[in-house]
Amino acid sequence: NFNWAKFTQNANFSMATFTQNTRFLRTIFFQNANFQGAYFKYIEPVFAMENLGAFFSVLTDPLNYVFMVNVHSPLSITPEQVTVADGRVFTIPVGCELFDPEPLPAPKPKEPTE
């Protein structure tokens, strides 16, 4: 169970075998997320449920989000494509969101006019 976890570095689950609940509700991925070759044996992985989707950073190269599990895995991760304003296309699990970890700068206060 990875609910509410924050992966501030690369999250590499490639070739991992999951035999229990695998939940990523409200999990934040600041960098790469790699599930290539992962094997989900009994229970489908959950990345989103109602308002509790995982978050993926738009500052990461879209190619570094990999959700293609092992071809022999009985369960998989259902992806969707999301296009951002600059035209980049991200493939992330259905129901998840992209976010920008660098907040916009606060507006400067206006100089008083005389």
Walk through the language-model features, giving the residues of each:
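N-terminal leader/targeting and pre-domain segments
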Residues: N1-E114
